[in-house]
Curated annotation (Swiss-Prot):
Functional summary from the UniProt entry: Antigen-presenting protein that binds self and non-self lipid and glycolipid antigens and presents them to T-cell receptors on natural killer T-cells.
Biological source species: Cavia porcellus
Predominant localisation class: membrane
Membrane topology qualifier: Single-pass type I membrane protein
Gene that this sequence comes from: CD1B1
Protein's recorded name: T-cell surface glycoprotein CD1b1
Length: 333
């Protein structure tokens, strides 16, 4: 498996391209969210991801895997997919049943929600790491590593009891170990190859400036918007000349509907000091040609366009009115 992983890394990221290797997602993980409303009603949602790219989901009502990408199936045969569907269906039904039957053991009250994430990651050197973590109501509950269950401090006695309980289910351990150490590594290696054109696409960002709400008397909030870029890593900074402005505030990199990304970066500054500031954007798709937007230029250009358009529109309206009145007057005569 290690030799295969190293060969794939060499194929995906040729020599001298290690910086790009850090940009592309190399981990596959599944997310499970199970909501328990009462002792008879529960709902689970499961989805599979390559980094931040959704690959598919599991429909627990029909017991089928729904692939979101043409290449999401990777090199798995229809028979293998069917086996996974049956395994997931048995797991989901068993998980819900066990939780509901052991409510009193863990002193839990309805409604509540359990979240879980499990998967594997192709890391530097060609090795593959595995992970499984669980959360209760959004708080860390436990993690499983090397066939050992580790209760999280936030989980308290409930997490300790759960780890003690799950160790008794050898069948569950065997299934998890097989999925994490065999199925997942094979899948991540395959899907990275089959989805390479999409995974390694380059989409250039759009950038523009705006003014945010005033942070105080005599102050301006300068906002630099960067949107539509892929892959996710991006560098955005407010600058004065070549000097980075340490007061720059960066928001979270958020997903767009088309699987590109959006980032907003702000700077609070005295109004008289805004002149000469610029927003610089670095992204792999730009190939070293950084985007630089100067504060005031976009505003002045907008005013110039407005100053040209408004008089033209006024003249056009006056001409139409004059023509209409002249035409109406001639009809009367």
């Amino acid at each position: 498996m290690l030799l295969v992983a190293l060969a794939l890394l060499a194929f995906l990221f040729p020599a001298g391209d290690t910086q790009n290797a850090l940009q592309w997602p190399t981990s596959v993980h599944g997310i499970q969210i199970s909501s328990f409303f009462n002792h008879t009603m529960a709902q689970s949602r499961c989805s599979g991801w390559l980094g931040n790219m959704e690959l598919g989901s599991f429909d627990s009502d029909t017991g089928t895997i729904i692939f979101k990408k043409p290449w999401s199936k990777a090199n798995f045969s229809n028979e293998e997919v069917l086996e996974l569907e049956e395994l997931f269906q048995v797991y989901m039904l068993g998980f819900i049943r066990e939780v509901q039957e052991r409510m009193s053991d863990f002193q839990m009250e309805y409604p509540f929600e359990i979240q879980g994430i499990a998967g594997c990651e192709l890391i530097s050197g060609g090795t593959i790491d595995f992970f499984l973590r669980g959360a209760l109501e959004g708080l860390d509950f436990l993690s499983i590593k090397n066939s050992t269950c580790w209760p999280a401090p936030e989980g308290g006695t409930k997490a300790k009891k759960f780890c003690t309980l799950i160790l008794q289910y050898k069948g569950i351990w065997d299934i998890m170990e097989n999925l994490l150490t065999k199925t997942c590594p094979r899948y991540v290696l395959s899907v990275l190859e089959s989805g390479k054109p999409d995974i390694q696409k380059q989409v250039k960002p759009d950038a523009w400036l705006s003014q945010g709400p005033s942070p105080g008397p005599g102050l301006l909030q300068l906002v630099c918007h960067v949107s539509g870029f892929y892959p996710k890593p991006v560098w955005v900074m407010w600058m004065r000349g070549e000097q980075e402005q340490p007061e720059t505030q960066k928001g979270d990199v958020l997903p767009n509907a088309d699987e590109t990304w959006y980032l907003q970066v702000t700077l609070d500054v005295a109004a008289e000091e805004a002149a000469g500031l610029s927003c610089r954007v670095k992204h792999s798709s730009l190939e070293g040609q950084d985007i630089i937007l100067y504060w005031g230029h976009s505003i002045s250009i907008g005013w110039i366009i407005l100053a040209v358009l408004v008089p033209c529109l006024i003249v056009l309206v006056l001409f139409v009115l004059w023509f209409y009145r002249r035409w109406s007057y001639e009809d009367i005569l």
